[in-house]
């Protein structure tokens, strides 16, 4: 259940990325403006995606990752192992983590079949540097709506906001990956996880034909 929601959630995480014209100092505006642009692109490029599902990697790389705090999220996943890693190990890990996200997010976008969304009304940001924004995913085939809380973090230097985590039914995506990879980190360290991420990132993206 959690895995399904995490995958569906990426259909909303991806929209966070395309709003070049959006006000990056306001996470609500970025989410609302970018959502429409990304869903329009998914609709428009379906012929190309169906011919080559791995095209979704390019969509993720171009439209999503610039607006996700990849290194911050990756460091949270590592936990204490981040401090123990050498600069070279960190560099290799973040490169592998980025490629992993391209595959994982691309596979999530392959689930697109007409979902819509509702973003919670904007609230005053005040001095907050971490802001959760509730998004409800509505399925056209009558499945129950999925409620997700996206975690946004403000860059104190640039003032820009970026997404770094998502919580579904009280479960954080960061926490889920920490638990999933904890044994590997304990036994093989960051190098072992880096190699696994490289392996996962090579998997082909397959389309979800369920309608």
Residue ranges of each PLM-predicted region?
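Short beta-strand edge/turn micro-motifs at domain boundaries
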Residues: 145-175
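Low-complexity, acidic/polar, glycine-enriched regions of mature
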Residues: 136-138, 151, 194
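Low-complexity, intrinsically disordered terminal/linker segments enriched in charged
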Residues: 165-211
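Early exported N-terminus immediately downstream of N-terminal targeting peptides
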Residues: 24-105
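Bacterial N-terminal signal peptides
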Residues: 8-15
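Positively charged n-region of N-terminal signal peptides that target proteins for export
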Residues: 1-4
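Sec/Tat signal peptide C-region and signal peptidase I cleavage site
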Residues: 16-23
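Surface-exposed, charged secondary-structure patches
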Residues: 103-146, 200-211
